[in-house]
Amino acid sequence: MSETFGVDSLITDTADRLFSQICDHESVQNAELNGEATEIWNAFAETGFPWISIDEKFGGSGGTLLDALEVLRLVGYHAAPIPAAETGVLGGWLLASSGQQLPEGVVTVLPSGSEDLLVTRNGDHLTLTGRGLRVPWARAAEIIVVPIQVEEQTFAATVDPDDCQITPMTNMAGEPRDTVDFNQVEAFAAPLPSDVNLQTFRFRGALSRTALMAGAIEKMSQLSVSYTNDRVQFGRPVAKFQAVQQHLVWGAQDAALARMAAETAGREANRGDGAFEIASAKLIANQAAARATKACHQAHGAMGMTQEYPLHHLSRRLWSWRKEYGGDAEWGAWLGRVAVSQGADGLYPLITGGSAVLK
């Protein structure tokens, strides 16, 4: 796998080797059937990978956001059925940003924040009533983090899952996306700094899914090349047929496009902003996922639809992730509003300068 600029190669090489050992097709399949992947998570957690990019004084593993995003790319590449993004890049980030210590176990977050909750405040405690939908791995979480805005202040509210009613649900890939009901649940609320709010949380969620999708598209493209070179039809590998080659090219170019977009957005976010690049990258990855899954399934034919072959673990994750933290319509509309706000003379500087122009 190619090296990413600005990322510690020791981290990525170790993560890649680990996933190669613990995330084979059978393990991923069993995780979907059983609704949990305890052994995979435990092996992942023992290395400290979930908490990369979180300062050690809060219980993190140190490192940069770029390191964490590269690990997420590998999670997507290997279709690892674990809450890596929620525990570190999202939930862990909210906890550390509000000065709270990270727990040793799984952390999850409400993707929609407090949007669907009735919130009442009493000092540094909040009472939450309502329902959170499609909460990743809520059933396995030690803490549920809810980003909440009360008046002009944004808080990271922490909830004990035992105080909630959790209904197990899954996404298209069989990953836990549970329903969490809050019935006057007490939550501790720690204030977040001004640069961490519901909007920046939304962007960071989109960035996490972009990294995951970039990895999955890359692996899907590689599987397609390998399979079509091995599969012989009419006396030669099917990869020699022009129609199949066209599908392989589409898969490869979308893999390169998604990874380039994810890395660009990650670098800008690591510098402290990157809103324009993240929105662009999520839209690019969403569209690349749609094209690549079609092309790669076409290249595989019937084999790609079987349970025994791993392609579906990737394509079903892509179909699920592309809807999380903003679909095409949301990010396309956001980019359109930003472009219009810059006026005709500001369009080219926006394209070439990105978020730096918006400051």
What are these regions (language model features)?
Residues 82-83, 93, 98-218, 222, ...:
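FAD-binding core of flavoproteins
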Residues 34, 61-62, 82-88, 110-111:
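Active-site nucleophile and cofactor-binding loops and adjacent substrate-binding regions
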Residues 71-72, 80-93:
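Hydrophobic alpha-helical segments that drive targeting, anchoring, or assembly
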Residues 1-77, 203-359:
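Alpha-helical interface subdomain recognition
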